Amino acid sequence: MWTPPRNDQHYLNWQWYSSILSSHAAMCGCPDAVAHFNHLASVLRAPQNPPPPGPQRNLPLRRLPALPAAPEAPGDRAPWPMAGGAEGEDGGAGGDADHGGAAGGPEDADLLDAVAAAETRPQETQEGHRGVPLQPRRGAKRKLTFPPSQAPQTSPPVGRLAAGGKRVAKLRGRDTDRLPAAQAAAAATANPGSQTQTPLQPSPKNPTKSRYQPYLVTKGGGSSILISNSTINMFGDPKPYNPSSNDWKEEYEACRIWDRPPRGNLRDTPYYPWAPKENQYRVNFKLGFQ
């Protein structure tokens, strides 16, 4: 359905120009959107329009820089300058001539001597020098071994005298597991301490009567009664109530409103003769239970 335009020509042109500036700001960071548009029009072969007045400027475009040039071939590279002052393979002429023209001072000469000695040294055998075994690798388990003359002295087995006067070695439970059934039974008989002990039974509770009795409260000077079985007023016994003339006036006003007889004692529950009695049910059918 066609509707008349809501904006005039001037406002529509302003909206179009604002949209061009917003789209250019979202894409490019140059300050002149009009010059950027003219540059694109000339590059993209757009219909030629008269150039804008003023000098033409080459605006820098936002693009990635070119990659650096590829490195030269290894044979074309210049030799690394040595410490002797010259370049090339003979650049170490200023150094010590005994080391093949190597660069550096006495420290480098000592290092080269150590490397050469290590390369010319014969490789060690598995047993090492003079028959001494090599050290095990780090992390490997090593078992302690003792020569016969340096074996650790162990204490004699602890035992006790049997009935015949012979000393019987005291065996532990883990040692008796390795013996045959007959020897294990004999060892268990000889060592009663190694047998499984019977767990002690817990001692019975004290059968005597506890001396802590429930707290008793004496009410009104009478006999003692338990708190849980008695109703005690926190604020003491209520004092006798003497109604005033205003209380009796309210009582008769309530009787007139609720249509009930007055009470002789205002602490009594009021009686309503017209109210249905409690637990009055009328059943007009019979239940067929046997």
Curated annotation (Swiss-Prot):
Protein name per Swiss-Prot or TrEMBL: Uncharacterized ORF2/4 protein
- Give the matching InterPro entries: HEV_TT_vir_Orf2/Gyrovir_Vp2_N
Cite the record's Basic and acidic residues compositional bias ranges.
Answer: 121-130
Q: Where are the compositionally biased (Low complexity) regions?
A: 181-190
Q: Where is the composition biased (Polar residues)?
A: 191-200
Please give the residue ranges the record annotates as the region Disordered: 67-210
UniProt organism field: Torque teno virus (strain VT416)
